Amino acid sequence: MTYVAASSDAIPFPAAHFDVVCSLNSLDHVADLEKTVAEIKRVTRSGGHFLLLTEVNHPPTATEPINLPWSISNTFMDTFRLVDEKRYEIGDHNIHGQILRDARFDESNPANRPGIVLAKFERR
């Protein structure tokens, strides 16, 4: 495996280069969300997959400057087909632990609060 240091808004690979693209607890940390989303779409090949794991609906911070909505998956629907999406409680901010515990988001609780979105997409 070769590691390449690059900005998420200018991925140094040709279009349709990757079979799988992952954004794991990173999308709310990027400098330019629109450019990053465009790059994800650009570098994923047709029939390839995009895996998204992100915190949503939280106040921006210095390290997480972007407040992503619960509807973040819709941002990718013009290019990808949503294969699966799950929502989890934010808990103690241990994203992977919440998924392993299967701590699903309680949709019956009307409180406006942060959470986690885990989604799998297939590129059209």
Indicate residue ranges for each PLM-predicted region.
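A short acidic, Gly/Pro-enriched loop at the edge of an enzyme's catalytic core
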Residues: 6-21
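A short glycine-rich, Lys/Arg-flanked "PGG" loop and its adjoining helix->strand segment in the class I
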Residues: 34-49
